[in-house]
From Swiss-Prot:
Substrate binds at residues 64, 206, 212, 332. This is Phosphoenolpyruvate carboxykinase (ATP). One of its GO terms (cellular component) is cytosol. ATP binds at residues 212, 231, 247-255, 296, 332, 448-449, 454. The gene is pckA. Monomer. Involved in the gluconeogenesis. Catalyzes the conversion of oxaloacetate (OAA) to phosphoenolpyruvate (PEP) through direct phosphoryl transfer between the nucleoside triphosphate and OAA. Its main location: cytoplasm. The lineage of its organism: Bacteria, Pseudomonadati, Pseudomonadota, Gammaproteobacteria, Enterobacterales. It holds the Pfam family PEPCK_ATP.
Length: 539
């Protein structure tokens, strides 16, 4: 076990008193024993699976709680932060008063006082000059395991004199009984204070709150320094060619960037500075619903000792039923990045990106499997951040639900979306990068585009054959589509071919175009936004 001479006395500075014992930066073996301790109850308890990984449940919180997210409004954030408009659903950055913050902080520090605590010191960001040194404090072993997997693990030398830039206090066992009087959403809370540099978590057990909390902080700090902060995966080819994959949850970021032919930089959060693209994280957080060894062998084989499964169904014999979504469709696994064989080592960073891929899972069946974007279309589709989900309705009818999430990650943005677009475009122009829109969703047949076809499309983008292909223009959206690509069924490249008649596509496409136009109106309050309208669909 690594020791940093951290004492209970040191924790008094955070308001945490009478700590019984500190388990500092525990080893994986220690965490394994702690999680499987038969004396644990409820959501603290881990279960051993036949794959060697421990599985835990996070209760009713099987995903993030965006409605319970708050940021303290003070002199630091008042004029810089992208605040939510009450009830307009623009984003989740709801302001919190200093008074309520102090109350929430008191609840969490009281919860952690007098306990045996796990403390993990780690880095967020692979570049030493811009990384955050983060200290995580929790009373739950598997939460310490989660952050050890997901953040960058310091060397023993780096732990000597480790000074945290940010403190995360996870009080999952405490709730806020005064939430109504304080005008909050519920008794649960995920609160950030960018002046005190502290994140507080109460009520929710979902591990991803710690991960995305620090992502929100990086999304605040980096663009103000001219560094792109991106919700994307990234990988690098044998010739050093870097590709980044933007996309919302479930569009294929992790799956498509985990490619045996290319080395993985990271699967979810990256920066892009003067040296190139770098990972914020030290692990991957992959969806496991319907995971199969055949379709996603790298991810399947990463699920072994030291990986941590969340909300999966474990049978009595210890086998995992990856097809069972009864607890949630958002079943997950976190694992240290070195569980993937083909990674960039020793530091998760590479040169400048030349291919920028926007992933969308279009459940309307309108968008083509791939199109090549102009510079203005790149900004338009980045700000739109479109995907669509299939949601079950009463009589078994599935109606697609459109989602527009600025920069393919509105939930984690702390500055105005146009600031991220400007920084990304500058980085792309300097590197001569080209953007593409790839639909990993459905077509007119009602079937999802196969991983095999999507991988062949990605290969064509990365090896340059798509750039050399002849293209035609798709009406309404004015997207440039290749007429043929190696290894891809030519019939599916034009989405109109997958409908009984072109009129059927036209009808659905018109409806989707209207949604795009309506959504983009929120960006037309600036001349830069107004200038991009012509890059979108035209009715």
């Amino acid at each position: 076990m690594r020791v940093n001479n951290l004492t209970p006395q040191d924790l008094k500075a955070y308001g945490i008193n009478d700590v019984q014992d500190i388990v500092y930066n525990p080893s994986y073996d220690t965490l394994y024993q702690e999680e499987l301790n038969p004396g644990l109850e409820g959501y603290e308890r881990g279960v051993l699976t036949n794959l060697g990984a421990v599985a835990v449940d996070t209760g009713i919180f099987t995903g993030r709680s965006p409605k319970d997210k708050y940021i303290v409004r003070d002199d630091t954030t008042r004029d810089t932060l992208w605040w939510s408009d009450k009830g307009k659903g623009k984003n989740d950055n709801k302001p919190l008063s200093q008074e309520t913050w102090q109350h929430l902080k008191g609840l969490v520090t009281h919860q952690l006082s007098g306990k045996r605590l796990f403390i993990v010191d780690a880095f967020c960001g692979a570049n030493a000059d811009t990384r955050l040194s983060v200290r995580f404090i929790t009373e739950v072993a598997w939460q310490a395991h989660f952050v050890k997997n997901m953040f960058i693990r310091p060397t023993d030398e780096e732990l000597v004199g480790f000074k945290p830039d940010f403190i995360v206090m996870n009080g999952a066992k405490c709730t806020n009984p005064q939430w109504k009087e304080q005008g909050l959403n519920s008794e649960n809370f995920v609160a950030l204070n960018l002046t005190e540099r502290i994140q507080l978590i109460g009520g929710t057990w979902y591990g991803g709150e710690m991960k995305k909390g620090m992502f929100s902080v990086m999304n605040y700090l980096l663009p103000l320094k001219g560094i792109a902060s991106m919700h994307c995966s990234a990988n690098v080819g044998e010739k050093g060619d870097v590709a980044v994959f933007f996309g919302l949850s479930g569009t294929g970021k992790t799956t498509l960037s985990t490619d045996p032919k290319r080395r993985l930089i990271g699967d979810d959060e990256h920066g892009w500075d003067d040296d190139g693209v770098f990972n914020f994280e030290g692990g991957c957080y992959a969806k496991t619903i319907k995971l199969s060894k055949e379709a996603e062998p790298e991810i399947y084989h990463a699920i072994r000792r030291d990986a941590l499964l969340e909300n999966v169904t474990v049978r009595e014999d210890g086998t995992v039923d990856f097809d069972d979504g009864s607890k949630t469709e958002n079943t997950r696994v976190s694992y240290p990045i070195y569980h993937i064989d083909n990674i960039v080592k020793p530091v998760s960073k590479a040169g400048h990106a030349t291919k920028v891929i926007f992933l969308t899972a279009d459940a309307f069946g309108v968008l083509p499997p791939v199109s090549r974007l102009t510079a203005n279309q790149t900004q338009y589709h980045f700000l739109s951040g479109f995907t669509a989900k299939l949601a079950g309705t009463e009589r078994g009818v599935t109606e697609p639900t459109p989602t527009f999430s600025a920069c393919f990650g509105a939930a984690f943005l702390t500055l105005h979306p146009t600031q991220y677009a400007e920084v990304l475009v500058k980085r792309m122009q300097a590197a001569g990068a080209q953007a593409y829109l790839v639909n990993t969703g459905w077509n007119g047949t009602g079937k999802r585009i196969s991983i095999k076809d999507t991988r062949a499309i990605i290969d064509a983008i990365l090896n340059g054959s798509l750039d050399n292909a002849e293209t035609f223009r798709l009406p309404l959206f004015d997207l440039a589509i290749p007429t043929e690509l190696p290894g891809v069924d030519t019939h599916i490249l034009d989405p109109r071919n997958t409908y009984a008649s072109p009129e059927q596509w036209q009808e659905k496409a018109t409806a989707l175009a209207k949604l795009f136009i309506e959504n983009f109106e929120k960006y037309t309050d600036t001349p830069a936004g107004e200038a991009l309208v012509s890059a979108g669909p035209k009715l």
